[in-house]
């Protein structure tokens, strides 16, 4: 029995399912989840001392690679001064100033402790600002586990009140309308019918929770136009894309300005952090300035601010994101070439330093249906073959992958060699 198998059995005694977040359980790919004990640069090391090139990156935050020396030094320095004060600090102001300078749409920002808190708070703020109850989200887009966002799409143009988790009251979920991602016509039709009741549209500008689906040409522009037309707040959920697809996030990458944005992952440099912000007029509704309440004991805690500030400063150097995007492109091109040579139907998607892998014969992946039509069973086999080859991919066919600045030519060769063997075995 491996050390991971032993630890997983032990974990299940007191942790539901043996994990503290469901995707970690490997249910989508089968087998025993790996337990890691160390991470450095582009690598993670499991409890049996096997090293893997890591394309999960703690689900996105580790854009500098694991254990960057300057980030660790910043955290160690803060440790000498205490863990948390529950009071304002100079670093919070410095962080707010930096975030607002990097993301032009952010005129004011509020720190929280997770991406879920950020999206939950942004939606409450949009409702308070507009005085409306309904929200629109899209198929396959995940915005955290707050009740109003755990709603899935059904068939037809518009689905109301279909909770995708037990414990979400139907009366609460009925205010969430779910539309097809990349379908601006559905948005136009819905807003024409019920636009006066809609507080906000929340969208992942790149859908990173059905692997990696970039916006179709005109989709984000259409959302901006329709929100302006109907007085609806446009929220970009950049928890995943923020500071990754470009320094200014997806909104900078695609040139679209939302009213509110949510961030997480990279903004904390590996610590539990989220933030939300946007137009000063809207943010002025948040307590203590306005009537929309939001609070948090550990919001803006100094350890997280130290890690996040250092990370954002390091990734702000000229050329950083170009290097990341170039590596990601070379890796995906290499995978595609090897899949084609093996005769395996395969397609990739990319937005900066995030990517998607699909076992599909489609020319492109644009919709939720395209994603669901891909061969998840073949991905399972590919995942384990790559794992055997020393490459750790996201353990789900529906999660995006991430690269870091620590990935280089050596890691690229390991990845492509493992993929060549894997594709040959998948014939």
UniProtKB/Swiss-Prot annotation:
The modification N6-(pyridoxal phosphate)lysine is found at residue 265. GO terms for cellular component: cytoplasm. Pathway: Porphyrin-containing compound metabolism; protoporphyrin-IX biosynthesis; 5-aminolevulinate from L-glutamyl-tRNA(Glu): step 2/2. Its EC number is 5.4.3.8. It is found in: Cytoplasm. Keywords: Cytoplasm, Isomerase, Porphyrin biosynthesis, Pyridoxal phosphate. It catalyses: (S)-4-amino-5-oxopentanoate = 5-aminolevulinate. It comes from the Bacteria. One of its GO terms (molecular function) is pyridoxal phosphate binding. Homodimer. This is Glutamate-1-semialdehyde 2,1-aminomutase. It comes from Pseudomonas putida (strain W619). The lineage of its organism: Bacteria, Pseudomonadati, Pseudomonadota, Gammaproteobacteria, Pseudomonadales. The gene is hemL.
């Amino acid at each position: 029995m491996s050390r991971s198998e032993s630890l997983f059995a032990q974990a299940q005694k007191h942790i539901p399912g043996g994990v503290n977040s469901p995707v970690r359980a490997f249910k989508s790919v089968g087998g025993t989840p790996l337990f890691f004990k160390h991470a450095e640069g582009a690598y993670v090391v499991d409890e049996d001392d096997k090293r893997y090139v890591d394309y999960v990156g703690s689900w996105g935050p580790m854009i500098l690679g694991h254990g960057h020396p300057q980030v660790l030094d910043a955290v160690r320095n803060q440790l000498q001064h205490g863990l948390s004060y529950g009071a304002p600090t100079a670093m919070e102001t410095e962080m707010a100033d930096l975030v607002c300078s990097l993301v032009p749409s952010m005129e004011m920002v509020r720190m929280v402790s997770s991406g879920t808190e950020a999206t939950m708070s942004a939606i409450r703020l949009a409702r308070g600002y507009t005085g409306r109850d309904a929200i629109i989200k899209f198929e396959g887009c995940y915005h955290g586990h707050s009740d109003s966002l755990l709603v899935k799409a059904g068939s037809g143009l518009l689905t109301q009140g279909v909770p995708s988790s037990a414990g979400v009251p139907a009366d609460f979920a009925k205010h969430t309308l779910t539309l097809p991602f990349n379908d601006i016509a559905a948005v136009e039709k819905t807003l024409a019918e019920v636009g006066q009741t809609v507080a906000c549209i929340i969208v992942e500008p790149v859908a990173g929770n059905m692997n990696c689906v970039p916006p179709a040409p005109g989709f984000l522009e259409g959302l901006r136009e329709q929100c302006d037309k109907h007085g609806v707040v446009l929220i970009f959920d950049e928890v995943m894309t923020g500071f990754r697809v470009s320094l200014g996030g997806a909104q900078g990458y695609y040139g679209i300005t939302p009213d509110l944005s949510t961030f997480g992952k990279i903004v904390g440099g590996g610590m539990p952090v989220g933030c939300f912000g946007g137009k000063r007029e809207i943010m002025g509704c948040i307590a203590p300035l306005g009537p929309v309440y939001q609070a948090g004991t550990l919001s803006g805690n100094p350890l997280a601010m130290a890690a996040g500030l250092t990370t954002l400063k390091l990734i702000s150097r000229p050329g950083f994101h170009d290097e990341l995007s170039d590596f990601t492109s070379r890796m995906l091109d290499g995978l595609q070439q090897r899949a084609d040579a093996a005769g395996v139907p395969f397609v990739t998607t990319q937005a900066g330093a995030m990517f998607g892998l699909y076992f599909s014969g489609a020319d492109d992946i644009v919709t939720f249906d395209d994603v669901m039509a891909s061969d998840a069973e073949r991905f399972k086999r590919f995942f384990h073959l790559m794992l055997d080859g020393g490459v750790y991919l996201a353990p789900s066919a529906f999660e995006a992958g991430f690269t870091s600045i620590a990935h280089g030519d050596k890691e690229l060769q390991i990845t492509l060699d493992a993929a060549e063997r894997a594709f040959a075995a998948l014939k």
